[in-house]
């Protein structure tokens, strides 16, 4: 569930088409036929096996139904979904990311799932990410996630630095990075340009916000927010942090697993893939909660961005009745448990976190994901509002301009404030 490219989605095409009357799109093309043969479209091939376990469990109880899981890459997924929405040929079942929920829900594309989702079984964040602007639920919460601190135990041992734990603050992060660099020549904390897996977490730990609670006002220039952004950007000025140019050539993930750096932030959704991809590193790295802000403007200094994905179906699909029944199944404890036991994502259903945690030991992976689960207690909803597709690419470019020295940090923060304010006004 890579998030980096998620923020580059083109939404204007679908928005324009929908406003011309293609609301409540059905499924009349090659994707489905209305004969009990359904297509389930996802964007992550790594989760295909887990989704097939779900469909197999459902089909066992419904032998007349056939559901085919189709996986594509992220960019292709949204290109195809947008095209199918404007040509009345949507897949019967598909994933919906919070980035795009408002666009599809508010234009009548998605079926209302309010009657099949028991909101008490899911976190407020998971439900909010499945809602349209009208407050109705347009998808079944699939999973939930966290941003985690990944660290290399061997490098820490070489430097004589204690492993990160829940007492760590930003000061510990920088002090450990400095000592690691001095003792080993390896990078410490690798602070790459990113919002969800980067500076947003520091903003909310410092008591700041990117948007106000209802998403109607930008908060970049508020002291708690701007100070945290400056802190994060300035981390790159240390010798122990790679430059953004270096990250553009070699990702933090690649640098970490090749032994060049000791720490970076990653998504919980990446951990299973890390384990299966970098098998030679098994037992040499682990995960911890995010360091807290030592002197926040408000709050206790703890926060972590949490997001979620939803299962959805078209409002007027030919197989809508079957699709809705399947969504009811994946909303159940049984359906959510099956997904958790696949190991790729933390189930959205409250109380099933251990089904995901346990898969790591079951597969022989020597890390401790149970360390990160307590962060859900102070998690913060992924930053989003209906105008996000308009402002996000411009904000991202501004961040890159700051790093490149094309604009000062102060001017860049003001620019981000103006960009988001204008986008909200035009929505």
Task: Show the residue positions of the predicted features.
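Glycine-centered hinge/linker elements that transmit conformational signals in sensory
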Residues: 177-179, 217-245
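Periplasmic solute-binding protein
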Residues: 102-109, 127-164, 191-214, 300, ...
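Hinge/lid segment of periplasmic solute-binding proteins
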Residues: 97-148, 174, 182, 201, ...
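Alpha-to-beta junction loops
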Residues: 85-96, 185-186, 258-266
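Short helix-initiation/N-cap motifs at beta->coil->alpha
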Residues: 71-80, 99, 168-174, 244-258
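Conserved N-terminal structural module of periplasmic/extracytoplasmic solute-binding proteins
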Residues: 2, 7-15, 22-103, 109, ...
